[in-house]
Amino acid sequence: MVVLAVLLPVVFGALLLLGLPRALGVLGAGLSFLLNLYLFLTHPGGVAHAFQAPLLPGAGVYWAFGLDGLSALFFLTIALTVFLGALVARVEGRFLGLALLMEGLLLGLFAARDLLVFYVFFEAALIPALLMLYLYGGEGRTRALYTFVLFTLVGSLPMLAAVLGARLLSGSPTFLLEDLLAHPLQEEAAFWVFLGFALAFAIKTPLFPLHAWLPPFHQENHPSGLADALGTLYKVGVFAFFRFAIPLAPEGFAQAQGLLLFLAALSALYGAWVAFAAKDFKTLLAYAGLSHMGVAALGVFSGTPEGAMGGLYLLAASGVYTGGLFLLAGRLYERTGTLEIGRYRGLAQSAPGLAALALILFLAMVGLPGLSGFPGEFLTLLGAYKASPWLAALAFLSVIASAAYALTAFQKTFWEEGGSGVKDLAGAEWGFALLSVLALLLMGVFPGYFARGLHPLAEAFAKLLGGGA
């Protein structure tokens, strides 16, 4: 079943790239969402729907996939965000085909149980993102593309060395995750392996100062917001630290933990500070994403079960509300021709539905209780406090700042006087709005249900690091 979930969007994406109608892509995105909703609702715990087949058996490489509670949650949020984008983003069929292809590669990344296969999906998921930027981006897309590729190469080569070292230096017979965990690295080897992983994953989180690719990536991408929403979903560094880097090299992590905690807190505060000064929605959301990923990383780096669980939940939730805000920004651009904050005012008068959706998405971003951002932020800060009270305080300041920049942007755009004449939500946009709000409410009101598969993983993670029961 997990293989079907990975292949379904890839097949529909390939059909769209061959020139079939865009409506087929909406159907494919909808079917993918329904399938992943079913997989999440029926997930029995543990690693379900496991699939394993030899790829290069002589080299110890296997097509190995499985769905645990963590990957099941990400399968759901990724498929939901792509479906929402397919509903409302006015893009041509081939663009949507690239989006579906990227969805399938992201699902493969989150389900991979073989380290080398994970590396392949980790890198392959970049290809559709690069093509969307190159083919459909703005005037400065070439520079943004070069920056993106440069940072990717800086992380990719050390990561490949770490992947090979994790097996060869440990004596594991295969690249399968369970075999690697059963053959722990020696302390010196663990440091170098972790360093290779950490560089790549810090770029893809991203953490300050390895975030320079992020603002131009969003600013120059297609104004529909679909590529930006997918870029939000590709911020997989926190997941990769939790799934691979830290469990495979805990001694290496222990040597770098203090620095990583500091960089995570700094990323949270720096991102919030720059977002407050942003003049357009894409820049605001890019730096807000940096800030939220810093908070999520802080939770995982704390090594506590609360922090890890909160950081991962925040990562999943942010894909929905940040992705939703990028798509909303695309709707604003279609109506006004600009993304500049304050350029259009008083939108709530002529577009109350659009304004209500924006308010709920922004409130989820700032962590209002009852919406999806709150449970992850609360648990993350709780876990971070146990590891470092003063760094948790810095992260808390970023949460306060998020309310300032988000609500200020909302006020300038929707609430101040200035008859805008912008039309309200219509047609499929109402479906986008209702599904988004429903997801934000359910994840905020019933976090225990959505995070039911995270708790045992977070406990095992903390126990590995000496912080669990």
Swiss-Prot record:
List the subcellular locations: Cell inner membrane
Q: Which organism is it from?
A: Thermus thermophilus (strain ATCC 27634 / DSM 579 / HB8)
Q: State a GO cellular component annotated for this protein.
A: plasma membrane
What is the protein's known function?
NDH-1 shuttles electrons from NADH, via FMN and iron-sulfur (Fe-S) centers, to quinones in the respiratory chain. The immediate electron acceptor for the enzyme in this species is menaquinone. Couples the redox reaction to proton translocation (for every two electrons transferred, four hydrogen ions are translocated across the cytoplasmic membrane), and thus conserves the redox energy in a proton gradient required for the synthesis of ATP.
> So what does this thing catalyse?
a quinone + NADH + 5 H(+)(in) = a quinol + NAD(+) + 4 H(+)(out)
Q: Which family does it belong to?
A: Belongs to the complex I subunit 4 family.
Q: What class of enzyme is it?
A: translocase
Membrane topology term reads: Multi-pass membrane protein
Q: What protein am I looking at?
A: NADH-quinone oxidoreductase subunit 13
